[in-house]
Amino acid sequence: MNEYDKALMQGPSIDTVCCPFCGRLASNAHHIVPRSHGGHDGPTVRVCGMGNASGCHGLLHSHQLHLRWTGSEWQYLYTPEPTKYEKALEKGGWKHVKTDC
């Protein structure tokens, strides 16, 4: 597990009825740290989309929607093109993740 994943493992799960990014019904759970990176027991976020292909769930898997834990809150960033996490962290425009809907 790399340093970025370790930081993400510190945050709590985001368990909302609606997708915290777009407000649609949240029908899937997404592992914030991929299971393949050791995130089996890590935090998850409930998101819209079918499987890994559509909605915000698809954007997370295609590396266009990124999450970061600040130590006190989750923030997200949308990028129009797939972007490596390290590069996304350098960009401005991060927004607070909505946990109430």
Descriptions of predicted regions:
Residues 1-28, 48-50, 54:
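Short cysteine-rich loop/turn motifs with clustered Cys
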Residues 26-36:
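Short recognition patches in nucleic-acid-associated and regulatory proteins
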Residues 36-46, 54-101:
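Polybasic, low-complexity binding patches
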